[in-house]
Amino acid sequence: MKTMYLALVALVTLAACADTSGGYNPAGFEGGSGWNDNEISAEDLNDPTSQAYFENSVGNTVLFDVDGFTLNSSAKVALDIQAEWLLSNPGYVIVLEGHADERGTREYNLALGFRRAQSVQEYLVARGVSGLRLKTRSYGKERPVEICSSERCYEKNRRTVTILSQSLS
């Protein structure tokens, strides 16, 4: 009985410490830009030069096929729109984050995420975005948007996210 009481006290204590302020929304998926997305103002969303506008109106994520890093037609359409916005807003440095689903080894998925980010980088450069503004990074399977064992989840995690890291102006 004493053990059950201690377990109940520990559970209540942990529940009281829970943070309900918005939490982490993985960068770049469904408008996510990181911590506390609820702090985006309507003014930022309506400013066509803002990071919030880019994420929510232009879109900052492209998805990939299983075990692939080749851009499909919908990814190219999304990147054409991104390139147009990036050319109109030259003051930003861009970080391209490559991701993979949970299948495969850590090392394999880091390499795959890097190849996905490179594919996006090459496409944006071909559309006129300066390569000096673009940096690539891979998280492999380390930062999933969703964790589950279905193709629907895996599909969301096979992505490259375009992050506007800073304004140069």
Where are the regions that the model predicts?
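Short beta-alpha junctions and helix-cap segments that line functional grooves
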Residues: E146-S150
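Sec-dependent signal peptide recognition
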Residues: K2-V9
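A non-catalytic structural micro-motif
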Residues: G91-H99, F114-V145, R158-S169
